[in-house]
Amino acid sequence: MSNVPSELKYVASHEWLRLEDDGTVTVGITDHAQEALGDIVYVELPDVGDTVAVDDEVAVVESVKAASDVYAPLTGEVVAINEALEDDPEVINTDPYGEGWMYRIKPDNADDFESLLSAEEYQAEL
């Protein structure tokens, strides 16, 4: 059974989101997604300053099994990326909700965060 922390929000395409104190949102892939992918060997992240819209392809995660696109769950500006993933992408496998975060976005509309899936709603999608 995949770990689905209750304090996070989710989208059906298997990304998790955490609202930070400064109003930005940290995004990564879920435990379910990393389990399905297997050992992650490469991550392509967006550039800081990129503007993304909901459902835009924003990153790529490659594993020994497949390459998988990561889609933007919110519209906004990318304000930070997890550069550590470039040298150590497998941290997504070992700590998907912590050190394995992928990027941080400043959403255009803060209310959009509240409309995302709760942990219970996401688990029902699995």
From Swiss-Prot:
One cellular component (GO) term of this entry: cytosol
A single GO BP: glycine decarboxylation via glycine cleavage system
Alphabetical list of Gene3D superfamilies matching this protein: 2.40.50.100
Oligomer status and interactors: The glycine cleavage system is composed of four proteins: P, T, L and H.
UniProt cross-references to CDD domains, sorted A to Z: GCS_H
Keyword annotations: Lipoyl
Residues where N6-lipoyllysine is found: K65
Cofactor: (R)-lipoate
PROSITE patterns: BIOTINYL_LIPOYL, LIPOYL
Protein name per its UniProtKB record: Glycine cleavage system H protein
Cofactor note: Binds 1 lipoyl cofactor covalently.
Domain Lipoyl-binding, first and last residues per copy: 24-106
Cell cycle in keyword set: no
Purpose of the protein: The glycine cleavage system catalyzes the degradation of glycine. The H protein shuttles the methylamine group of glycine from the P protein to the T protein.
